A protein has these predicted regions:
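Non-catalytic accessory segments flanking enzyme active sites
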Residues: 42-46, 53-64, 76-78, 93, ...
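Asp-box/WD-like beta-propeller blade repeats and closely related beta-sheet repeat scaffolds
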Residues: 116-163, 168-202
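Predominantly five- to eight-bladed beta-propeller fold
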Residues: 72-74, 109-114, 118-121, 175-203, ...
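Signature of short aromatic-glycine-proline-rich micro-motifs recurring in repeat-based ectodomains
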Residues: 40-45, 89-96, 188-208, 288-289, ...
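Beta-strand C-termini and the immediately following turn/loop, strongest in propeller blades
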Residues: 54-60, 68, 96-99, 105-116, ...
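Residue-level detector of Asp-centered blade-edge/turn motifs that repeat once per structural unit
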Residues: 49-50, 99-100, 148-149, 207-208, ...
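Surface-exposed loop and turn segments in beta-propeller and other repeat-based domains
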Residues: 29, 33-34, 77-88, 173-195, ...
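Blade-loop segments of beta-propeller domains
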Residues: 73-111, 131-142, 329-332, 378
Length: 446
């Protein structure tokens, strides 16, 4: 391994030297690390709720501009740091809409933590009033999320969950009290869950906005791991220019104990917290929780340590009674990404499974009974993109016809299939929230 590393370094140095001799610009570490060489594409498209419009942040990170899905033309500027009332910042990093589309959460001063997690100072922007105001004065927040009625925001600070009520002068209350670094984490995953299961938030509101559910991670028994921090070039850590620092976090190596996880619900009116118990192996995982459209019904996903058995429980978040409604097993491995392909509708939910040898789209009712297998054949469904209730039409991305390419398809109630993209290559799509339009992204070798 040392020889390979040395050979790699020598090759890089030789390549850089050769480039310099030939008058070619040398590669710079900052350029490599910053994404300078990424292919150009349209980025940051955010579909607006209940509409055929989308938004983008401008390159200067000073405006949020509204566009039409139908024409691709700019319609209006929804937010501008120079004209918004009481705006004290000059740039912002990201944003999200409330479910009713009347408000936005705008993130500033973002500080990355791990691959997906970050802290930021968030502001609440009311579009009609053109008014910006701090979400909280208590310090940076993680994973702020609107309630379905758009009148509350939950977030995490210092491993505890907080709740802001927008109808009560943005009053803030603390939901959990036991959060502590390297011991108890509420509402956000530990490093292992974030890295292995690809998510950074473990908070969800009930459909009536009266309950809040979250995962608690107890990593008290997990062994710590430390590594040195140096000044560096990109990013720079000036505090460690003279003497290196140390970063310590809980890191369970293979075969060692993981964090103990539990699911809890919080009644916002009564302020009662309940633990919801589901059958799970001692070393099992809870990679996601999500409220369904049915009031009080919480979906809890569990995986065994080998990650080849996925269970879906539906729990009553008030009574804490749970029931197993779906189990999917694989001889090898179940990709955790399939959990994000599960979308709950009032009477049904979608599910991707390899149970017949290929990853296909399945349609279940809310009790876990299979209604139908939507797609079949010697190909795979890569992504479920949506279901139109009015026409009973499914939209998805598939590699049918060529395993090296993907296309966007729709299939109606009579199983009539239509290809929606014509160009050969890897096709991706972002749909409007009404499913009336989509933006297609094509990647090809030519």
């Amino acid at each position: 391994m040392k020889r390979l590393n040395l050979l790699f370094i020598c090759l890089i140095l030789s390549f850089s030297s050769l480039m310099a001799q030939n008058g070619v610009k040398e590669l710079q570490l900052e350029e490599i690390s910053s994404g300078y060489f990424k292919p150009e594409t349209i980025q940051g498209i955010v579909p607006m709720p209940n509409s055929d419009f989308y938004t983008q942040m401008n390159k200067e990170r000073t405006q949020i501009i509204k566009y039409s899905f139908q024409t691709g033309e700019a319609v209006e500027v929804l937010f501008d740091v120079n004209t918004a009332r009481d705006c004290t910042f000059k740039q912002f990093d990201s944003y999200s809409f409330s479910p009713d589309g009347t408000k936005m959460l705008i993130a500033t001063e973002t500080v990355p933590i791990y691959r997906r997690s970050y802290k930021a100072v968030h502001y609440l922007f009311t579009i009609k009033r053109n008014l910006i105001e701090p979400l909280s004065d208590g310090g940076p927040q993680q994973v702020p999320v609107f309630s379905p009625d758009s009148y509350q925001v939950a977030f995490v600070r210092d491993n505890n969950i907080f709740l802001v009520k927008l109808l009560y002068n943005n009053s803030e209350s603390q939901v959990t009290q036991d959060g502590e670094p390297n011991k108890i984490i509420n509402g956000i995953p530990d490093w292992v869950y974030e890295e292995e299961f690809g998510f950074n938030s473990a908070i969800t509101f009930s459909s009536d906005s009266e309950l809040l559910a979250f995962i608690k991670f107890d990593e008290s028994a997990v062994k710590s791991y430390s590594f040195p921090l140096y000044g560096g070039q990109f990013p720079q850590h000036k505090a460690y220019n003279l003497y290196p620092g140390t970063y310590t976090y809980k890191y369970p190596k293979a075969g060692e104990a993981n964090a103990k996880v539990s699911v809890h619900s919080f009644d916002i009116k009564s302020r009662v917290t309940r633990e919801i118990k589901v059958p799970i192996d001692e070393d099992g995982y809870i990679p996601r929780i999500r409220f369904t459209p049915q009031t009080d019904q919480l979906a809890i996903f569990t995986l065994n340590r080998h990650q080849n058995k996925l269970d879906l429980y539906i729990a009553n978040a008030r009574s804490t009674v749970s029931k197993l409604i779906l189990r999917d097993e694989s001889p090898q491995y179940i990709k955790p990404e399939v959990i994000d392909q599960i979308v709950f509708y009032p009477n049904n939910f979608s599910f991707l499974s390899e149970k017949d040898g290929y990853q296909h789209l399945y349609w279940y009712n809310s009790k876990g009974t299979l209604v139908k297998q939507v797609t079949q054949g010697q190909f795979e469904v890569k992504n479920f993109l949506g279901w139109d209730a009015n026409s009973n039409t499914f939209y998805y991305e598939s590699n049918e016809g060529n395993p090296l390419q993907t296309a966007i398809y729709k299939i109606d109630a009579k199983n009539r299939k239509t290809v929606l993209t014509e160009n050969k290559g890897t096709n991706k799509a972002i749909f409007s929230t009404t499913l009336s339009y989509f933006i297609s992204f094509l990647s090809e070798t030519t």
